[in-house]
């Protein structure tokens, strides 16, 4: 049988195109894998920092046996949870019980899509970036409520209801603060918001133009993360462990992971919205402006931008950890009153003032 040369070339070109498609598919996945690896490392660092700072505040010795300076303690804890038995409640709603932790984790991970960690380092630069984050973060309480309801446990159900009520109470002031920032920057893109703060360096940060909004955003973020003094959904003295009471093994570890991922996301958004993101603090000066732009300088600029962003984010982390061991837990009525009667009117007034100033400046 004689094979036509044209047919052979067609087959070869088809195989090459398929190979190129596979290569492009792998290249597209690489940034996501790099981001997931970075998130994992950051969570391990945050857990270690919290334990060390907490030990310092309480004047005791922190973790020191698992690895040098206790750096591997979080990995040891995660490995232990992986090896634990996954116990299911005999009278609970098993499908909802299993889905709840996954919904919480996925909703938090999706928030990283719109966070610009450095210059030209963002997975999705969307024109509605900040509002996409608010919409996605509103899904997490559904997973917590499902976890509490499906456990068939009064403590778990109470914790799930508290989580839903707390999220709704503080989501609205948070949204008003983000709206004010969006009006000031004339954009809802996270990248545009960072670039709008770059002209005057340290003095161009939204922190100085929105001090009231910054404080409201800070308090609301802590409440959304369910950190002390806002950890009512899992108050140990009242609800054993809240919606986590019936969970064990890897599913309990997922809730543990969600709390630190929430803290990391909130820290990064405080940095992006109010602290200038990856920008230097010196106005009108760009270190890389003295060099001819090429790939190496571009990569170096991105790496330094990521370092600056994370350094600013760790400031919020330090504040949240310090607050945890400084302020006592609030009652549920105090928490709701703070959200509805105090933060909501202040954030709404701040939004109206920002809107008025923008209209006057037109």
UniProtKB/Swiss-Prot annotation:
Reaction catalyzed: a plastoquinone + NADH + (n+1) H(+)(in) = a plastoquinol + NAD(+) + n H(+)(out); a plastoquinone + NADPH + (n+1) H(+)(in) = a plastoquinol + NADP(+) + n H(+)(out)
Ranges that cross the membrane: 27-47, 94-114, 128-148, 164-184, 202-222, 247-267, 303-323, 335-355
Topology with respect to the bilayer: Multi-pass membrane protein
Gene Ontology process terms (BP): aerobic respiration; photosynthesis, light reaction
Molecular function terms, GO-annotated: oxidoreductase activity, acting on NAD(P)H, quinone or similar compound as acceptor; quinone binding
InterPro entries associated with the record: NADH_UbQ_OxRdtase_su1/FPO, NADH_UbQ_OxRdtase_su1_CS
Main location: plastid
Entry coiled-coil feature ranges: none
Intracellular or extracellular location(s): Plastid, Chloroplast thylakoid membrane
EC numbers on record: 7.1.1.-
Family membership noted in the UniProt record: Belongs to the complex I subunit 1 family.
HAMAP family found in the cross-reference section: NDH1_NuoH
Subunit note: NDH is composed of at least 16 different subunits, 5 of which are encoded in the nucleus.
Described purpose of this protein according to its UniProt entry: NDH shuttles electrons from NAD(P)H:plastoquinone, via FMN and iron-sulfur (Fe-S) centers, to quinones in the photosynthetic chain and possibly in a chloroplast respiratory chain. The immediate electron acceptor for the enzyme in this species is believed to be plastoquinone. Couples the redox reaction to proton translocation, and thus conserves the redox energy in a proton gradient.
Protein name from the UniProt record: NAD(P)H-quinone oxidoreductase subunit 1, chloroplastic
Phylogenetic classification of the source organism: Eukaryota, Viridiplantae, Streptophyta, Embryophyta, Tracheophyta
């Amino acid at each position: 049988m004689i094979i036509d040369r044209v047919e052979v070339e067609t087959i070869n070109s088809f195989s090459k195109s398929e190979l190129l498609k596979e290569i492009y598919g792998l290249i597209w996945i690489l940034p996501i894998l790099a981001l997931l690896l970075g998130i994992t490392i950051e969570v391990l660092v945050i857990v270690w920092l919290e334990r060390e700072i907490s030990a310092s505040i309480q004047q005791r010795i922190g973790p020191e046996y698992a690895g040098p300076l206790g750096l591997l303690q979080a990995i040891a804890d995660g490995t232990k949870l992986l090896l634990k038995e996954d116990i299911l409640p005999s009278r609970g709603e098993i499908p909802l019980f299993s889905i709840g932790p996954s919904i919480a984790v996925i909703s938090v991970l999706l928030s990283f899509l719109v966070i610009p960690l450095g210059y030209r380092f963002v997975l999705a630069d969307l024109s509605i970036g900040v509002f996409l984050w608010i919409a996605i973060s509103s899904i997490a309480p559904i997973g917590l409520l499902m976890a509490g309801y499906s456990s068939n446990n009064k403590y778990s159900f109470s914790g799930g209801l508290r989580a839903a009520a707390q999220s709704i109470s503080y989501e609205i002031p948070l949204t008003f603060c983000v709206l004010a920032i969006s009006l000031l920057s004339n954009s809802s893109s996270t990248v545009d918001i960072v670039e709008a703060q770059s002209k005057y360096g340290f003095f161009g940060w939204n922190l100085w133009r929105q001090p009231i909004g910054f404080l409201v955003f800070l308090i609301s973020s802590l409440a959304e993360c369910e950190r002390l003094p806002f950890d009512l959904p899992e108050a140990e003295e009242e609800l054993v462990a809240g919606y986590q009471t019936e969970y064990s093994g890897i599913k309990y570890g997922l809730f543990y992971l969600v709390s630190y991922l929430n803290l990391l996301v909130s820290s990064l958004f405080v940095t992006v919205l109010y602290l200038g993101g990856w920008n230097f603090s010196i106005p009108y000066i760009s270190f890389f402006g003295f060099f001819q732009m090429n790939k190496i300088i571009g990569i170096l600029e991105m790496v330094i931008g990521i370092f600056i962003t994370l350094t600013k984010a760790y400031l919020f982390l330090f504040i949240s950890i310090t607050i945890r061991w400084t302020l006592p837990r609030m009652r549920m009525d105090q928490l709701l009153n703070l959200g509805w009667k105090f933060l909501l009117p202040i954030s709404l007034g701040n939004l109206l003032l920002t809107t008025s100033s923008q209209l006057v400046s037109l």
